[in-house]
Amino acid sequence: MKTIIFVCHGSICRSPAAAFMARKYLKELGREDEFKILIRATSSEEIGNDVYPPMRRELIRRGIPLYPHAAQRIRQIDYDNADYIFYMDYENKYSLMRQIDDYKSILFPINKWTNSITEIEDPWYTGRYQLVCDEIEECLKDIFAKM
């Protein structure tokens, strides 16, 4: 079983959306037993908080099953046990590079195999939850097509 960690700044919008969408997509593909999906933050600002309400509403609107969630900051032990860590934007990447030893081998942008998307913007600032979920969905399809 491969361990994938989705990471964003606070772990209340993008990374939980990616994880919940990935779980649904993998179940549809019959591949849910191949992957352990985790959610982490690069900051400690939102530790313990659930998914941000506007993102929660967008996931519900899309029929994405929600799971219990309390934001956690990524730790070295998470990295040590991960096969892939997918970050949403370059701010996340630089935060991870400062926090994690030997980050290079498993740290990837979520859009690694998606040419049409440069970064996943933070909807907490932009309010564009639908667009963010559309982009995450496209990235996830490309990720799991390659794995």
Where are these regions (language model features)?
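Phosphate-binding/catalytic loops
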Residues: Y84, Y90-M147
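Helix N-cap/beta->alpha junction signal
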Residues: S15, D89-Y90
